Amino acid sequence: MTSVSTQLSLVLMSLLLVLPVVEAVEAGDAIALLLGVVLSITGICACLGVYARKRNGQM
């Protein structure tokens, strides 16, 4: 099983390779997309952490 950082870097690299092909996407759109992906992953990890702590009775 690959690590999370490896998977995340693979996703970001694939996005960076695909985005320049699309003509309608400008630099600002690409930055907004990458920022949204990073914030979404961070939010999901935070929710999973809260769930795990509640399940173990630490909260």
UniProtKB/Swiss-Prot annotation:
PANTHER family per UniProt: SMALL INTEGRAL MEMBRANE PROTEIN 30
Gene Ontology biological process terms in this record: innate immune response; negative regulation of type I interferon-mediated signaling pathway
UniProt-listed InterPro entries: DUF4730
Originating gene: SMIM30
Extracellular side: 25-29
GO cellular component: endoplasmic reticulum membrane; mitochondrial membrane
Induction: Down-regulated following vesicular stomatitis virus (VSV) infection which releases SMIM30-mediated inhibition of the interaction between RIGI and MAVS and leads to the activation of type I interferon signaling and innate immune responses.
Transmembrane helix found in the keyword field: yes
UniProt topological domain (Cytoplasmic) ranges: 51-59
TM helices/strands, residue ranges: 30-50
Subunit organization: Interacts (via transmembrane domain) with antiviral protein MAVS (via transmembrane domain); the interaction disrupts MAVS interaction with RIGI and inhibits MAVS aggregation, resulting in the repression of type I interferon signaling and innate immune responses.
Subcellular location: Endoplasmic reticulum membrane; Mitochondrion membrane
Short name of any one Pfam family annotated for the protein: DUF4730
Bilayer topology term: Single-pass type I membrane protein
Record keyword Mitochondrion present: yes
Segment forming the signal sequence: 1-24
Protein task: Negatively regulates antiviral innate immune responses. Disrupts the interaction of antiviral protein MAVS with innate immune receptor RIGI and inhibits MAVS aggregation, resulting in the repression of type I interferon signaling and innate immune responses.
Protein name: Small integral membrane protein 30
Keywords carried by this UniProt record: Endoplasmic reticulum, Immunity, Innate immunity, Membrane, Mitochondrion, Signal, Transmembrane, Transmembrane helix
